[in-house]
Each structure stands twice: as structure tokens, then as C-alpha cells.
């Protein structure tokens, strides 16, 4: 795997960034074409074993379940300091599900900095 510097951050990331929009719990979020956790973990494990250390996800991908699956896979297959996770926090979520009428969740810094 080839690696490059990520801007001026000092981080080295794989030239391939694995997008995780297709990973998630079916029924959470606006689309039903996501891969369930078992299939997602298989892809993530192979990716890590082949040197991919750069992953892209978002709070709105399957209403957060993409981030959850990625987090568990990283915990099982890599050291957290060996991977770079790019995410987005702009997608309004209500009660963990897109489109719910309940109050917004996860829109503050405290939700993302753990």
C-alpha cells in the first residue's frame, strides 16, 4: 500500500480511503441498500490487513450505524492510533434516526469528542 501525508497534519494515510456509506443497519437511515455488520466487518478486516488505514464515514450514514460498525471493527482489527477516520457532523439527526420528530441528538462537540 502506498501512503501519503494528509495535508499539513503530519498524518500518513493510505492512498485509498475506504468510504463506509454502504455499511450500516438496514432500516436505520433513508436507504435500504446497506451491508449488515457481518459483511461490513469482513470488508473492513480485509482492508486493514491490506494496509488501508484511512476511512470515511458520517453521522448520517445509516443514522450513525456506519460509524458504530467502523468503530467496533477498528477496535477488533487495528490499533486506534494506526487509523484515520474522517467523518462529518452536519447531518441533523433526531433520536438516532433521520427524520424523527424527537429532539436533535449528536449535534454538539461533546457527542463527537469521546
Where are these regions (language model features)?
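N-terminal binding-site loop/beta-alpha segment at the start of enzyme catalytic domains
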Residues: 1-84
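Active-site-proximal loop/turn and secondary-structure-junction residues that shape catalytic pockets
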Residues: 22, 89-93
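Glycine/proline-rich, positively charged
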Residues: 27, 96-114
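Proline-centered turn/helix-capping motifs that create local helix->coil transitions or kinks
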Residues: 79, 94-96
Amino acid at each position: 500500500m502506498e501512503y501519503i501525508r494528509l495535508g499539513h497534519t503530519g498524518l500518513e494515510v493510505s492512498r485509498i480511503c475506504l468510504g463506509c456509506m454502504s455499511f450500516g443497519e438496514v432500516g436505520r437511515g433513508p436507504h435500504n441498500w446497506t451491508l449488515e455488520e457481518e459483511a461490513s466487518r469482513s470488508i473492513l478486516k480485509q482492508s486493514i490487513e491490506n494496509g488501508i488505514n484511512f476511512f470515511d464515514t458520517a453521522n448520517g450514514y445509516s443514522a450513525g450505524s456506519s460509524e458504530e460498525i467502523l468503530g467496533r471493527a477498528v477496535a477488533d482489527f487495528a490499533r486506534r492510533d494506526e487509523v484515520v477516520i474522517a467523518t462529518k457532523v452536519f447531518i441533523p439527526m433526531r433520536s438516532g434516526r433521520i427524520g424523527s420528530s424527537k429532539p436533535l441528538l449528536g449535534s454538539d462537540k461533546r457527542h463527537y469528542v469521546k
